[in-house]
């Protein structure tokens, strides 16, 4: 092999020369052997990642993976948390199409990076939507809002902020809760504990257990609260119960962290679904709110969300925002522009906003209709048990009370897919598919699986 000689005019040249002499010190075959023995080379050696095991599918998203592999013409996917039309098709809201067309027609729009905090107009409008335009926190500039990557991203940013800057590192989440919650907060650096919420015996709220567990929590602990349409149970506290929860939490200095993934999607009213949050803000205390526009605007794939932190003063809110930027910058630098722009167009335009509320109400009403139809279908079949929880629960999901063995039976024999805890997405049902689901539930219950 030919040797290349460098002059010693610089330390850089000397280092390069030393490296080449090292490479040339052995035979060509030795060098090639050394090269191919390197674990990161393109040779025939094993991968440095060969020790990895195959990770299981996500328990929720994996339902759709299994569904897609099933060739059955009668298969039914009730696992995914996404709205479907009566024909079982994904829905893009008309108001979203109109907003997008406005954006397309605006030739002045550019695709530059957003600030770290996101689209400022979107942030202001999101705060007004969740807290109310007349909120004292907004009026007094005691709130900071940053655009995040849908609900998951909002929770993660909030979790990391609390892990870095809040004196308590423990967060209490409901038992049960959305499967991603414990992972989000654990990886954010918080210690996750649970508080009682659902009563399997009544298929309703275990309110006494909830109060006891929050009452026993260490002062200052963080408490994750589902603002409405609890996932996965569909069981929400009454306004009177929310008031008791608020008083208890404020008396112990517990920090409320609201997950608002379904505003307007639960009752059909944006204001009704935001009432628990507004109760906490009205007392002058501090709290965090994670918002998502995946469900209520159907912007699942646009990943549009916001994190709002209500503070005691405008000065503190400004400092909080400065620290949120330091959390976001190394995580994803700045959020996407398109989805937030769609939301901003709809929220700022009175006509589009009104049209959105009508479409939102129509989606909520269809889900309520599916609940009634399923309940009536089970009653008509004489299915053993009390199924009234189906019409008492609220929002996208119903916690059926079916166990994993029963779920497995329904998947195998009836090609119905849902999470193993028996949660079904009512938004995935239609008038045509309700009888098939009712037949499957009736069969699995009467067979005592």
UniProtKB/Swiss-Prot annotation:
UniProt keyword annotation of Transferase present: yes
Gene Ontology MF terms: L-aspartate:2-oxoglutarate aminotransferase activity; pyridoxal phosphate binding
Catalytic activity: L-aspartate + 2-oxoglutarate = oxaloacetate + L-glutamate
Cross-referenced SUPFAM superfamilies: PLP-dependent transferases (SSF53383)
GO biological process, one term: biosynthetic process
Tissue specificity: Expressed in roots, cauline leaves, flowers, hypocotyl epidermis and root hair cells.
Presence of keyword Plastid: yes
Residue positions binding L-aspartate: 81, 178, 231, 423
Induction description: By ethylene and dark.
Assembly and oligomerization: Homodimer.
Misc remark: In eukaryotes there are cytoplasmic, mitochondrial and chloroplastic isozymes.
Protein known as: Aspartate aminotransferase 3, chloroplastic
Source organism: Arabidopsis thaliana (Mouse-ear cress)
Gene name in the database record: ASP3
């Amino acid at each position: 092999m030919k040797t290349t000689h460098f002059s010693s005019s610089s330390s850089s040249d000397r280092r390069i020369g030393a490296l080449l002499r090292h490479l040339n010190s052995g035979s060509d075959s030795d060098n090639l052997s050394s090269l191919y023995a390197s674990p990161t080379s393109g040779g025939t050696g094993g991968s440095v990642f060969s020790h990895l095991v195959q990770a299981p599918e996500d328990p929720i998203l994996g339902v759709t993976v299994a569904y897609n592999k099933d060739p059955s013409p009668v298969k039914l996917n009730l696992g995914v948390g996404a709205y479907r039309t009566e024909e079982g098709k994904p829905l893009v809201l008309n108001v979203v199409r109109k907003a997008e067309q406005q954006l397309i027609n605006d030739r002045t729009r550019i695709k530059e990076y957003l600030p770290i905090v996101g689209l400022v107009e979107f942030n202001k409008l999101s705060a007004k939507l969740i807290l109310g335009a007349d909120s004292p926190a907004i009026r007094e500039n005691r709130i900071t809002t940053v655009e995040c990557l849908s609900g998951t991203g909002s929770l993660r940013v909030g979790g990391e902020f609390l892990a870095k800057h809040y004196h308590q590192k423990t967060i209490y989440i409901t038992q049960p809760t959305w499967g991603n919650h414990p992972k989000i907060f654990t990886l954010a650096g918080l210690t996750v504990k649970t508080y009682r919420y659902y009563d399997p015996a009544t298929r309703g709220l275990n309110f006494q257990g909830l109060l006891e567990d929050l009452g026993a929590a260490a002062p200052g602990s963080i408490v994750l609260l589902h603002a409405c349409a609890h996932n996965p149970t569909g069981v929400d506290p009454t306004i009177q119960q929310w008031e008791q929860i608020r008083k208890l939490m404020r008396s112990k200095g517990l920090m409320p962290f609201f997950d608002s993934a379904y505003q307007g999607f639960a009752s059909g009213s944006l204001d009704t679904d935001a009432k628990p949050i507004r109760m906490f803000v009205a007392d002058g205390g501090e709290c965090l709110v994670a918002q998502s526009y995946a469900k209520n605007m159907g912007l699942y794939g646009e990943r549009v969300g916001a994190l709002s932190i209500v503070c005691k003063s405008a000065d503190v809110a400004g400092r909080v925002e400065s620290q949120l930027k330091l959390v976001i910058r190394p995580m994803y630098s700045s959020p996407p522009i398109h989805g937030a722009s769609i939301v901003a167009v709809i929220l700022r335009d009175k006509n589009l906003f009104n049209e959105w509320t009508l479409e939102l109400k129509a989606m909520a009403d269809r889900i309520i209709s599916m609940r009634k139809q399923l309940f009536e279908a089970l009653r008509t079949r004489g299915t053993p048990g009390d199924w009234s929880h189906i019409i008492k629960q609220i929002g996208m999901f119903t916690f059926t009370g079916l166990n994993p063995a029963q779920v497995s039976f329904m998947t195998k024999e009836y090609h119905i897919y849902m999470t193993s805890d028996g949660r079904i997405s009512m938004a995935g049902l239609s008038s045509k598919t309700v009888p098939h689901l009712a037949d499957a539930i009736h069969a699995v219950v009467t067979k005592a699986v």
